[in-house]
Structures are given as C-alpha cells and as structure tokens.
Amino acid sequence: LVSSGKRRIGYIGGTGFTMGLHEYPEDGRLTAFRNWTERLGLDAEGLIYAQGAFTVDTGRTLGEEAVNDHRDDMPDAFIVAADTIAVGVLQAFTAAGVLVPRDTSVISINNQAIAQYTSPTLTSYDIDQNELADTAITMLAEAISSRRTLHHHTFISTTLVVRDSFVPA
C-alpha cells in the first residue's frame, strides 16, 4: 500500500478470541497493524474500527461507521482483518456511494473463495494453509516429545492476490 502512495490507511476488523484457557481481547492482526503503521510513521488515529465478531454483519456495521466518520475525506485504503468482514465493508461502501478502488482501496486477509465473487473483486492475502498445518503439526510433535510447553513465533508465507479492490502503482 505504502509503495503505491497510500499514506492514510485504516483498519477494519473484529475483536477478541479464545485460545486454550486464555482470552485475548485484541486480535493479533490489529496488533500487527498498529506496529506496522508506527514503524512506517503513518498516523492511524481515528482510522481503526475493530469490534464484534468476524462476520459480514460486523463488516457492514463497521463500514458504515467508517463512511459516517470520513464521508468527505476517506482514507486512501483499508486493511480488513478477514474476507468475511470485507464483504460487509464493500456492501456498506457501495450503499453509501463510496467507489472502491477510486475513493478508497480495500485489502483483506485469508483469500477465501468469496473474494473472487464480491463487487469489486477483493484483493486479499493468501495464507499458505499447507505450510500453516505443517508448522502446527511440527510444533505439536516437538511439544509432545519434550513434554514441556514451547513458545514459538513463526512467520507463514503469504501472497497478495491482486483483484479489483486495490490497484498497485
């Protein structure tokens, strides 16, 4: 996004999840977005919309909020935490007359099948599911064989699948 000249970049996503016995009030994608904007010197103040479940309805509601807050000055782009949320965001933008990608760009995460059927079609990060599964199985086997809790931070390959909701420079 930044290499395409986008400087005002917002975030739209859900909140919280439970893993094991631990509840996490903030989704890791939002944490990554905050870190990323800080490192790049981007101001995301007032451009983060994160609440609710990872659903189309949540996306529509948060998309409507973003339009109401920025109708006359839409951010250059939004990163959306999941394709299901992005479907609702695109619906809200279309209903409000916000044209994607002319008025703002949208990039999502997961590259689910629905991404190719939205209007406009959704640019989305594809996460290598095979690599993710292999890594999880390897980590599980290590934890079982060592009989102790191991903590790993692992980066999984992603590929940006460019469709109509974002036109790179």
Residues covered by each model-derived region:
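Bacterial carbohydrate/catabolite-sensing allosteric modules
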Residues: 1-169
